[in-house]
Amino acid sequence: MGVFNEYKRLAAGKLLIASANLLESNFKRTVLMMCEHNPQGSLGFILNRPMEFQVREAVAGFDEVDEPLHMGGPVQSNTVHFLHMRGDLIDGSEQILPGLYWGGDREELGYLLNTGVLKPSEIRFFLGYAGWSAGQLEAEFEEGSWYTADATPAMVFSGEYERMWSRTVRSKGGEYQLIANSPELPGLN
């Protein structure tokens, strides 16, 4: 699929996948869930960059969440964001795709988690986000930095972080299957 067609497919609710050519450390071999994509810019969260500490250790009010906090991206890395499956329970949630929601009332979220109504496996917390201004992401597509793919809530909440990039690239089929199996630094082979 050509670069133009890849970019045309990009929308909120799609996956943004770093191409094998994208070596910039913030995004090398990342898979992002896109939550906004419009003429003003784009916003998403890196799905496969868990941090070395748990949500309960880093986010006040979420003492029962023994799940990793994730690096969502390099923008505003002092802010906490969350994706979850329960828009029916959390006021102010924005549906990204059926069964996947972004944000909502944090106090309500904390109560639901701490009382066991909401399971930690139904939510993913991110520190910061990935953001692009108008035209910036389109230019990166033209440079060959990104691919797109369809998303499901199961992909967002999968715990297989290390293999997420290769599995997602492979799922595109065709020439992408070869790319998915390529080593990170082919020149060192």
Swiss-Prot record:
GO cellular component: cytosol
Entries under Pfam families matching the protein: DUF179
Coiled-coil annotated spans: none
InterPro entries per record: AlgH-like
Record SUPFAM superfamilies: VC0467-like
Similarity annotation: Belongs to the UPF0301 (AlgH) family.
Name of the protein this chain belongs to: UPF0301 protein Plut_0637
